Amino acid sequence: MPTWTDIKDHARSSYKLADEHDHSFKVVFEYPGNRLQAVIASHYHAMGRSWVDFSSACCRADRLDPQAALRQSFNLAVGSLCLDGDVYVVRHTVMVEHLDLADLEVSMHAVARAADQIEQSLPIYEPASDKVSDVEEERV
């Protein structure tokens, strides 16, 4: 059974960490078309157990209809699509005692790939015209 330290050490030896703290680290994956997708692994305790949460942001809440988000979440092989503030994230949580270090890479890649695919599936975002004029007025 790995510890959080084992998990961080394994991630550090396998990837260049973009960010690291006592209870979290971030890995950035690159996909075709120079797209980048960050995954944050966070460690916490709940229900008397140690957990690792993998999350990757995919879009702002206003870019995805809630029903479409639920359909997207249902179709994910790993994790779920969640609303974190005003951002949708793909999230997958595992008990540390059940995590094999080889599965660490599978979990991170699955979350990153799912978030990237959701983001890619969205139409190109065009801001509302009133928002653009507000920004232009602030610059003047």
Report residues per predicted region.
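Generic alpha-helical secondary structure
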Residues: 4, 8, 62-63, 104
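Short, well-structured hydrophobic secondary-structure segments
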Residues: 32-54
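Short, internal acidic amphipathic alpha-helical interface segments
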Residues: 48-93
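Ampiphathic alpha-helical segments that act as solvent-exposed interaction surfaces
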Residues: 70-77, 93-125
